[in-house]
């Protein structure tokens, strides 16, 4: 059996744009659940949720990337980048060959299916 080490984490969610903000919001007891705001929300039976607000993709991606990446991909890549930065590791050579990513989502990419 090989040893697994969690070296970094990242998140963009309804109460924070990174781990530090999220932990601060949790300590303050902040709730990220609110009315959902997007097109066709009236078709849903539940109209509240943990929606991400104040995310500005153009601060993180160039025009070509924005045309290729849906919102889910943008958020996923940014959270991954945060995790890599937090790890302090440089991913080259042997370490690159034994590195993996575990991703969790509660329905990512659904907007792309709708489109």
For each feature predicted by the language model, list its residue ranges.
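Conserved "HGTGT" condensation-loop signature of ketosynthase/thiolase-family condensing enzymes
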Residues: 1-115
């Amino acid at each position: 059996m090989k040893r697994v080490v969690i070296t970094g984490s990242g998140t963009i969610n309804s109460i924070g744009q990174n781990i530090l903000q999220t932990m601060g919001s949790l300590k303050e007891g902040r709730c990220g659940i609110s009315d959902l705001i997007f097109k066709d929300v009236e078709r849903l039976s539940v109209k509240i949720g943990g929606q991400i607000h104040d995310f500005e993709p153009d601060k993180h991606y160039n025009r070509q990337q924005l045309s290729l990446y849906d919102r889910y991909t943008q958020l996923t890549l940014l959270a991954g980048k945060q995790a890599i930065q937090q790890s302090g590791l440089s991913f080259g050579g042997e370490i690159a060959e034994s590195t993996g990513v575990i991703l969790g989502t509660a329905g990512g990419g659904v907007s792309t299916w709708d489109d």
